[in-house]
Regions:
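C-terminal beta-strand-rich structural cap/linker in extracellular carbohydrate-active enzymes
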Residues: 172-203
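Conserved, mostly hydrophobic/aromatic
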Residues: 58, 133, 161
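A glycine-rich phosphate-binding loop feature that marks nucleotide/adenosyl-phosphate handling sites
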Residues: 1-2, 107-116
Length: 203
């Protein structure tokens, strides 16, 4: 039942492993499952051939990742020029935000399987006063920006937002974020953003 599912940890959440360029199914699985089953995991694929967009499309409270290979076939030795630094960088990015998947989930866009859609969601930790916004722009989208109305924020509080990719920070009030929304600009196709936020503490 739903109560049991909410306490389960499915290490492999579906028989359909989405390793397509757009990762539409992986995004849709996460969007749907986080409403009911907060702890789950799927595969991002092999770390020598995935992008940040692929990684972020597959992120959840758990993540399965391989170094290299070809399914169940016998595997050749890992080559000496394997991009270990790149693989480590991707894994460290995921580990740096994994804790937010134990927070409250809020979808910021509609559910869609369209190749030209954006999907975004918010993970909020009310006890800590912080959270994470995950934004995914699919390959077919011609749009370069979106305004996302955030949830569960105090209108009277100022929040600091840090873009993981650019390092740019900005401060906005909860009132601005829940009415006008958070502006996100993504120029590439596909593209993605990870944006951390925290309530500003008064000194």
């Amino acid at each position: 039942d739903l109560e049991s599912l909410g306490r389960a940890t499915p290490l492999w959440r579906t028989d359909f492993c989405d390793l397509s360029p757009g990762r539409v199914a992986a995004q849709c699985h996460t969007w749907g499952l986080l409403h009911w089953i907060p702890l789950n995991s799927t595969s991002v694929g092999y770390l020598d051939s995935v992008s940040r967009y692929h990684l972020r499309s597959s992120m959840s409270s758990g993540l399965v990742a391989g170094l290299s290979g070809a399914g169940d076939a016998s595997q050749p030795p890992i080559p000496e020029d394997y991009p270990f630094d790149r693989a480590r960088e991707l894994l460290m990015e995921y580990l740096s935000v994994r804790e937010f998947y134990y927070g409250d989930f809020y979808p910021l866009t509609e559910y869609s399987q369209a190749e030209d859609a954006w999907m975004a969601y918010q993970l909020d930790r009310p006890e800590q006063g912080d959270g994470l916004v995950v934004v995914l722009k699919r390959p077919g989208s011609p749009y370069t920006e979106a305004f996302l109305r955030l949830r569960a924020l105090d209108p009277a509080v100022t929040y600091r937002f840090d873009d993981v990719d650019s390092g740019i920070s900005q401060e906005l009030t909860g009132a601005e974020l829940t009415t006008d929304g958070l502006r996100v600009e993504l120029l590439d196709r596909p593209d993605s953003a990870l944006i951390r936020y925290a309530a500003r503490r008064e000194s």
